[in-house]
Swiss-Prot record:
A Pfam family recorded for this sequence: UPF0203
Domain of life: Eukaryota
PROSITE patterns referenced in this protein's UniProt entry, alphabetically: CHCH (PS51808)
UniProt motif (Cx9C motif 2) ranges: 38-48
Residues of the signal peptide: none
Disulfide-bond pairs as recorded: 9-48, 19-38
Name of this protein: Uncharacterized protein C119.18
Domain CHCH: 6-56
Keyword terms, alphabetized: Disulfide bond
Biological process per Gene Ontology, one example term: intermembrane lipid transfer
Similarity comment: family membership: Belongs to the TRIAP1/MDM35 family.
InterPro entries per record: MDM35_apoptosis
Motif Cx9C motif 1 positions after renumbering to this chain: 9-19
Length: 69
């Protein structure tokens, strides 16, 4: 698994990736489409990413790109 955009978010990304991969292989492919085991880990990773994007001043670039669509 790759590192996160921000080094401080890599541990949260790795936890989420492991959870997602387990869910996908062991639940989703067996028909359990509504499992929410990884939601909390995703929220933690997303929060870290959003904070890092603001710190690195990347968030204005993302907003501008979204407006172009």
């Amino acid at each position: 698994m790759s590192s996160s955009v921000s080094e401080e978010c890599t541990p949260a990304k790795k936890k989420y990736d492991a959870c997602f991969n387990d869910w996908y292989a062991n639940k989703f492919l067996k028909g359990d489409l509504h499992n929410r085991d990884c939601d909390e880990l995703f929220a933690e990773y997303k929060s870290c990413l959003l904070k890092a994007l603001k710190t690195k001043k990347i968030d204005p670039l993302l907003e501008a790109a979204r407006k172009e669509d």
